[in-house]
Amino acid sequence: MIDPEKHRKLIDFAYAKCLEIPRRKKHCSIILCKNKILAVGINRFKTHPLAVKHGYLFGEVHSELDAYLKCEKRDGLELWNFRFNTHGQMRISRPCPKCLPWCMKVFDKIYHTMD
């Protein structure tokens, strides 16, 4: 079961990160291990060899991959995905069909926001 206090802190942290994103689609991924934040990623317009390998289009790196590339640890990881609209309301932010297969391989648990 998810600790409500931990969940609230992650939502607040992710929302603060999303406010820094200048684009309309504000996705934030947080990687945790033993309740410690190891890496944070956002959707970015840039290229990376792993993005090409996994079929990303338009030179975009999704927040899951952006966070994973920053994370040095490779086991016991939890992925938390968040998305907020321009009014600060949470929206669906589950991994896309291109991200989901590799996310299921590298993360022990995956959580995402819903409408």
Across the structure, where does each feature detected by a protein language model lie?
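Short, basic/aromatic recognition patches
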Residues: 1-26
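Short beta-strand scaffold segments in enzyme catalytic cores
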Residues: 26-40
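Zn2+-dependent cytidine deaminase-like catalytic core
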Residues: 40-115
